[in-house]
Amino acid sequence: MQNKCPIFWINYIFNVTLHLEMKYNTYTLDNGLRIIHLPSDSKVVYCGYQINAGTRNEEPGEEGLAHFCEHVTFKGTERRKAWHILNCLESVGGDLNAYTNKEGTVYYSAILKEHIARAVDLLSDIVFHSVYPQAEIDKEVEVICDEIESYNDSPAELIYDEFENILFKGSPLGHNILGTAEQVRAFKRRMRCASQGSFTDQIMRYSSLMGILISKNW
């Protein structure tokens, strides 16, 4: 995948009335990481990283690699095992999730404001310090292949994919986000290299929706 940059952001705003004149605070750290903060008085806060590397950045033969990287990023870091990642926020009523689209990859959380430091620490850990254990990668291959099989059972999804393939013919934008089962199995050992090339400070943005300003030290 071509080198693109991560960004920390928030896209899920459920308990806040939106106005046309919302005041965002924006910062750029010395390392190039961009931070966006929307103040809120809500007891629930939202934060996440947006990495500007999605399926449009995949090279020929890499279709599905961005989505694969998203899955295995949750499978362990230098500090945490997979089970710790899954339970870190859930144990205090928080939510941790991710998704991949044509333009980028997003890792985000929703949590009570008193636990925001826990969410930021976990998100930063999985984005910057994932270790991609080969055993977990091998298991996740089958999970993704099952997801692809379910996707292929949906005529509506297949029609939409064909429409995009025609509309963006010759461009990565026309590719299916999941790729094929054959591709997923073929490039599983290349996943670590692809992730390290995509998760750089210059293409990353951090966003938050909370009542306290984010320190530049974050």
Stretches with model-predicted labels:
Residues Q2, I7-L18:
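Short, positively charged and aromatic/hydrophobic N-terminal segments
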Residues I13-I85, C193-W218:
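His/Glu-rich zincin catalytic helix
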